[in-house]
């Protein structure tokens, strides 16, 4: 398996003649330091892996100092910089041009989680209400985007634009973490100015037409009474003296017959 994978990467190793190492231990990465070139890379790897070890929790892929991914055949972990000699022999790809296929089933978790994170950020950016408490502390940029979205929906949503204290307090209190408090405070101060301006408006301005609202706002869809009454008259529901929900005790044929007779008494003969 490893020889086949090494043959696919022919001619791309910087420290081997014709692309392959001489010694099989060096080729498989079993030695402590496979080559002098790899020994020079160990010093920047210590600081890089110490920083990335807190954010990357995937066992199959291991970030390298050259922005490549080393896929291990055994369960790899994010450790110092030295290759784990106690584990199974692992084929190491230190070149960033070659991305090895995932050997185990855990290898697909990295792109899948990145896609899921992209979908979550897209959902949070388009949602009208603040859900900053659902976001982890590792994404302060998403918190800034959500605060900007709250400013966009400040004037469109009549439920949250009543006074100056509601948007300002929600912008500063719902943002988690130390980094989020600064962004929440900024959004709260900007929202308080817009809220105080909208609080002086008359009550009729709060009833915004549904065409001016964004399509994501579901619970602010208003129903016109004239349109509703025209539908009731058109369907003949005003001539029915008893509601159809009260006829659930009878069978379906009797219900449909009585319903049609009451709706059109002159056309249908029972």
UniProtKB/Swiss-Prot annotation:
It comes from Homo sapiens (Human). Residues 165-198 have a biased composition (Gly residues). Coiled coil: none annotated. This is Cbp/p300-interacting transactivator 2. Transmembrane segments: none annotated. The gene is CITED2. GO terms for biological process: adrenal cortex formation; bone morphogenesis; cardiac neural crest cell development involved in heart development; cell population proliferation; cellular response to hypoxia; cellular senescence; central nervous system development; cranial nerve morphogenesis. Transcriptional coactivator of the p300/CBP-mediated transcription complex. Acts as a bridge, linking TFAP2 transcription factors and the p300/CBP transcriptional coactivator complex in order to stimulate TFAP2-mediated transcriptional activation. Positively regulates TGF-beta signaling through its association with the SMAD/p300/CBP-mediated transcriptional coactivator complex. Stimulates the peroxisome proliferator-activated receptors PPARA transcriptional activity. Enhances estrogen-dependent transactivation mediated by estrogen receptors. GO terms for cellular component: chromatin; cytoplasm; cytosol; intracellular membrane-bounded organelle; nucleoplasm; nucleus; protein-containing complex.
